[in-house]
């Protein structure tokens, strides 16, 4: 009893424990927790409001309702503490014990715990080896279960057998009364459970496992073995799943609150408990009265149902409802779901010392400041003010101080100023999608009621001033203030952690001002003047002698960085130079920090340029200078924009002159297609696709014409010649600078609105030819409203989906922290530039920046080391590597990091948000999840229908060289020469490479099967030359051998049909679909065999397989029977489906699909081994493909007939090569090609989605997620470890176990990699607290309780839930220091004990000598 109370005592100081264990409570345990039995269903007396004795709120059991006062009021005050009143039996103590003291109910009949019955898989069913249906029938009194066969003959009846009422009666008559025992209800199940000998069961199952060969049985046994072993190791008895005692929750946790008007609000649990008590008491009475069996049975069933409802209402049958027909909230519902205990109260708490208000812009603030309304500050900093008032002696008590503050005397404001100085506060804007959503600022007191926010941090908060609100939090403790100041201050967070780009980029007005000031103009006022310095320029400008945009020459003094190591001015060298520039740029150059050249701003500053400028400043001049520079840029931008006075008029929207013509042409083309459709030349779908194409193209043409007219104007220069210059049109300037609007929006204003989509996403074929300047008619307006509304609906959906993705990502990575500097890994991944279709999508520079290299990087010519092994590659290194034209670099990656239960800094590389090597303790997992989740709302939700123009654009028919060099072919390329001497490609995965003069690969192209190569290997090619061509609409089948074609099973009307071309009148044979053939010819496969002149079969080179070429459905046969066939000749062509509009999952769903590792529908089939392909006997709808490996072992695949098989008889394929077309399955890639290939696949696919939206995310974030998806392995052979085959284990745990086994000289376990989707990976984590707070709480807790799981509190989430510092950042070092300290204390205690023992055992004379050496060793 006492032990339990100690568990609930308020902790004094830091309660130190390292693990939390969960298990099942035995009846004795429940009774030991309890302070008394609850016998009555009464709650409180409605007149006196005092709790009823022995009821659900009984003060005797649960403690007094008022502090230090018994119920009858005999004992009051502190002096009677601990006394038990003899009149009312209440102990005099604190009232808050009512939050921790439990009671119990002694059940009149045992009851099964619903979680272990109904939570799938049913644990009761597993242990008893019975079906859930049977157990339910017994528990709910529909059937008997045999507990003891007794005197019945051998084999007539066995223990655990189920029998219905009628059978029971029949058997009783047959064998006599009392010959055997069969019971109904939980008692029967309990007796069965008690009769199980777990050790023996485990042995039998292990023996069965060894003996059996069937997969289904192995699975079944393994499941049961797992549950039984769990009971064995945890020491939990199976019969505890049946409850004889029910614990009662402390009353304060299920309160009863009086409302005005004499009514009460109560927790649903009280209702549920009342039902249990009522039914239990009634059952007790019935048993005492020896009521008829049927009545007792019904009451027992009702008791079981009442307890079920209390534990998990609605899990079985109908949910119990209260008076208002609403289902009652049971214990299970209290903890699960969004509003359950875990997510509502433990992971998301409300915070004291916080406030919220609307934000307004604060253009005069410095970057690290924010404006805080005085009244808000007064409320938030109250305790500090009280303290100050007392220390100054202005107020004597807190009460007086409170009065002083409330009257807001002048002294209070002075003290507020003082208290607030240098005390950072945190601002947060919901939704907090990444770590920059909370930043610390120094408050400046302001009048008014709105918080002022610095404009430059808006990008990070994603805030604007259209009514956004922000919350303020005050860090109270000194440590918290220090962390807020050093880690969270806005001026210390200038880079996005997602991609390392600056986050303090100006936008809108500022960009417009800077752009306007740095544009130059032909023939402006004062053009051609020369100035000695910037002061002169300013003077001339202010005197009105020169315009802001005039082109002038200025002498400018710059400071170049010469010595990076030096401090202060010693770093720079001064140099002066005359620049051709504009007045605005010269004036702006004043704000450049030292170390930046004038070249950097001697161009029109668009948004991208400004971002680059800030980035350069950060890398060259450091954080402090950059922050000052950004602030100055902001001030200048605002000032210049104001002075510029840019405004917009309707006349600025120029409608292109060619618009009418383009629209007329398009209309005529559409009419032409309508005619063709009417006369039946094209299908309706084709007509629709073409119409949509035409209008799409017309819209683009109008847009282009408009931009051309808008962007340039003709002006006279100084010599009165007409020249074109960029226009100063306001709308164009806004779009061009990146301040507001885009070309697409201007197109709607001044071009044509173009095609609109219906709500279902399909495109309406009549476009809106008008623009907003001309105005829309009613029909056009109506069509437009569709799109606008769909946009809003989509956004709402998207936000929810994106948030859910972020939550899953955070959950899977939450425990990944950098825990050491270097793991010593020597493997990594070789990075190259990303090339698609011969174009570089991502340069090598961006891919290796901020990574640690493996091995020295040497100069390609001189072989001298430029970058040493294990160096973090920064901008300078990368520039050097790129300049030397090195095109691949091996770098460390998160996936090959050897650190267990974490990561090392070297494998992670640069911390993108700070710019140096990542610190130990950084929670890189959560950062990765935020970086991927945060842009989620910008991704699209829809599935793209690709049809018409879009799909036609996808069909390439040749490869063009992009650069000069020598042509090389990859090792997988196989070529034959045909009769014309052309080179025909007969490999599926061949690649053509172009190598430059230095021997470096410039580009790489995939060459499809059947393509004709136009150059020989090693030929020199020029940029723009065509390397290979092919027919994009058909796939050929090419003969690799010469001979005479002999048809096999090619019968007209049976397997092939004659098709006559309408235009040419030529006939060809087409293979018909098996489904459309007659029954007899269903399984027959048409083939072409090659025979030589003598009629013998031509064999495949190096084998004894004849050359049989199978023809697929739809193949057009181009040779005749008996025709002579040359090498490289086309035997048949398979038309590619005229690019059906296929759906491409894009955007958010695609990202989710990749991270959930879902196998795609109709996935590609990859070869499991390297070997030779042949076709076996076909089944009804499938063809059998056999790959025979080098040892002669055959691997069979069954492939649906309608699938495109990419290989043919006799072809040699490599392991992991695609043999059937389709999207790749990540699981196959992992098993056949390994972790590295899988990572490359997932990273590339995810990046494709984000790149399409123009979002930059660093690869390493995606790699971090992939590492977490691979964190479990499957045991293939347990070796001498405790693991069984087929079990899934945490990788780090297995490595640890293997180390121990190897050290002992035994056999380690063998395993294979498993890829888990993020949801599954989160749920399979070793921490049950983390898994339970994520999803499927009931299942997770049920499983954990049976296994008696311990949670080692390794992740961040578990620690947040139990309320201690997270093991990341400062928390990690705190925890390590504590461990060291504890170890030291232990060692010291041992030494002292050893000394004392030594002293006790030593003869007295030589005592002095013994103590001396021990004294030296004392660590203190």
Swiss-Prot record:
Top-level EC class: transferase
Binding annotation for Zn(2+) 1: 70, 72, 85, 88
Pfam families reported for this sequence: RNA_pol_Rpb1_1 (PF04997), RNA_pol_Rpb1_2 (PF00623), RNA_pol_Rpb1_3 (PF04983), RNA_pol_Rpb1_4 (PF05000), RNA_pol_Rpb1_5 (PF04998)
Cofactor(s) of this protein: Mg(2+); Zn(2+)
Entry keywords, A to Z: DNA-directed RNA polymerase, Magnesium, Metal-binding, Nucleotidyltransferase, Transcription, Transferase, Zinc
Reaction(s) catalysed by this chain's protein: RNA(n) + a ribonucleoside 5'-triphosphate = RNA(n+1) + diphosphate
Binding residue positions for Zn(2+) 2: 823, 897, 904, 907
Gene Ontology terms for molecular function: DNA binding; DNA-directed RNA polymerase activity; magnesium ion binding; zinc ion binding
Signal peptide start-end: none
Enzyme nomenclature, EC number: 2.7.7.6
Cellular component GO terms held in the UniProt record: DNA-directed RNA polymerase complex
Function: DNA-dependent RNA polymerase catalyzes the transcription of DNA into RNA using the four ribonucleoside triphosphates as substrates.
PANTHER family: DNA-DIRECTED RNA POLYMERASE, DNA-DIRECTED RNA POLYMERASE SUBUNIT BETA
Name of the protein: DNA-directed RNA polymerase subunit beta'
Gene: rpoC
